[in-house]
């Protein structure tokens, strides 16, 4: 996924642009059902990670707990790995 490449490569401007366009795409599409919540949560968590970039230990812990408590998250495994 392009999101992973941008985040792991440190391309923050490109990642932010991708998140904005992906969010707009999700708003336009009405036929994707439950996938919308999964991807909206992914976007929300990646934005939180970007706001505190580079991640401090306290921010990692807070976001990791929030990801674990949220039921519908796309790419949960990748998010948890980034927050180790």
Regions found by a protein language model. Name each.
Residues 1, 11-84:
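C-terminal non-catalytic interaction modules
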